[in-house]
Amino acid sequence: MAGRWRKLLEQESEHQWLAMCIFCLFAIMGGIAIEGTSTLAGVDLGAGEAAHDGYRVLNIVYFDNGVDIASQLTHTYDPSQGHYLYSQTNTESVNSIYNPSEYDKGDEIRFINEMGDDRAMLSIASTQLVEITLGEQIAYINVNSSDEFWIDDYQENEGPSSAMMVTQESDGTSSIRALSYYVASPPLSNSNLVNWNNIVHLSEDKWVATGTITNTQSSGDSPASPTVRSAIGIIEWQGNLSVAPILTSFLTGDEGQIHNLLSTGNSQVIVAANTGAYQVKDDGSINEIEIPSQSAVTDSQGKTWFIGNQGTNSIATFHNGIIDIEELAKPIPLEIEISEYESGMIFMHGMDGNGAFEMMTLDTTVQDSIEDGRGFLNFAFLTIFSIVLLVMGWTVLDRFRKY
């Protein structure tokens, strides 16, 4: 046995060094090519055949109907005409829900939020919700309450049996009320004088609300121009409609503007602002994340994507406590106003440098797949490397048998 190995190693071949050099060159070129394709793939610009192409999108909800990702409920605005609300189930079907008339009430749409079971909720009248389903069925739901208030935000915990809403009370103050099957609780006591804006479910009986708070007592502040800071609160409600929700934790943040409040689906909530972000956990802790952004979305895996200002060359992600920076092949061409996630796609709506309204999309399913340039090169490199090793091994074994 030892003799065979010695004779084999003593053999000289003019092709051995050539083969080794070619393989080393292939490895180096492959590494350079992989590094060159390290930017995010799946980025595209343009609304395609969507009806909102060229219009400013104020609110939008994307539905996954299993056929066409373009299914959406859209609120657009045209300065020369007014507000429009319509649904689009495919590239050929656009159904109008609201068109501007002499008195345009479209600006009274305070929010449009996606619920479960292909539903969306909005509000345009006091103590009333409007439910719109994917099939364009519209239901006007009156909230059962002896008080009068406007609804600024509405969110559910797996259905209408447990829900929360941000309200503007008749006395002008901002508050939060719980609901169960559209019966409202008394309002939250707002001793901090917070102007609440949004709310989202955290876990069990806990919710996270965000807003702003005006501080006239800060050093250097003038009573005529007080400091406005972001506010984050954890709200608890045990399900008793005769009892108001309770503020159990409160944090005053920076002077930045909160633009997104996102549930990650694992008993955590991400608060995204233009000066940074916060991670709110079920145990009541609120941790700061140093990622400023213009807009943000959370995907189906619980990963949050932070989208920067126009001209930014990267997109930051946060998942399981880890921050990653994903480089873009080109800078972000839009000043993003709103963004949404549905079925692996991130939809970003905003305005370009010429003042035209556009849409940018990012297909998150392409990353590290065979469709991604880097994924393809990785696959090709591993395939060729495996073939070379098999050929070399077969050659060694064949020659070993001959000696």
Predicted regions: what they are:
Residues 252-317:
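Membrane-proximal low-complexity regions enriched in glycine and acidic/polar residues
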Residues 333-384, 397-402:
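Blade-level signature of beta-propeller repeat domains, shared across WD40, Kelch, NHL, RCC1
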Residues 36-56:
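A short helix->beta-strand "capping" segment at the edge of beta-propeller domains
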Residues 82-100, 128-144, 166-191, 227-246, ...:
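Surface-exposed loop/turn elements that mediate protein-protein interactions on large endomembrane-trafficking
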Residues 76, 212-229, 365:
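Short, conserved, GDST-rich strand-edge loop motifs in beta-rich repeat architectures
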